[in-house]
Amino acid sequence: MDMNQNRQRQAKQGLYRPAYEHDACGVGLVVNVGGGKSHEIVENGLQVLEHMAHRGAEGADSKTGDGAGMMVQIPHEFILLQGIPVPEKGKYGVGVLFLPKDQAACAACLDLAASVIGREGLDLLAVRDVPVNSEILSDEARCSEPAIKQLFITGSEDQAALDTELYIAGKKIGRAAREAGMACYIASLSTRTMVYKGLLTSHQLRCYFPDLVNPYFTSGMALVHSRFSTNTLDRKSVV
């Protein structure tokens, strides 16, 4: 099932009514109150998430989750180690995009995003393929697995102004994608934070995203989410 088909499933069907959606998720936060960044914060966040497995739903196969994710501060040093030519902290933003696995459709979405970014007076420095371990997914989860890309963007020298520019660009990318019938979902777009998430169980997040267990991947905070959809349907925007 591709992302467009998944979105179409959210419409009223059978006894399901989108207007009555509720969920019962688990949320946890690990933070260094002094502001210092370390990989320990990320590791502790993963442990908190795993200890909240009872707050997230999963299928009978124990491999299909309602969703799990983590928001972290942008790991500047880790990004430099990936060979991405970003400027100093606060002078660039990172967008996390979920795109179709089909190469042509994915390329079309990236072209659309790059076009909007350029029209907004921003510069797209680089696009990174986020490494994932698809082998841990169930067959059901693998059918809706997106291609996950990180976009590195520069603009105004002032961080607050750049965040505003990124917000506007993100909204325009989303609108243009919807009008074109493209399956392009922005998980995060900011100069400060980035998101790693998916239709995973709480225990799958660290295994699915190798970045999160890299000792050079650091943050001063880790906000985690374990989703229990209750009477909702699964979709990436609510993970």
Model-based region annotation:
Residues 235:
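Flexible, small-/acidic-enriched active-site or ligand-binding loops
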Residues 2-9, 14-65, 159, 166-190, ...:
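Extreme N-terminus nucleophile/cap motif
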Residues 238:
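Conserved small/polar residues in nucleotide/adenosyl-binding loops
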Residues 59-220, 224-227:
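Extended, highly charged
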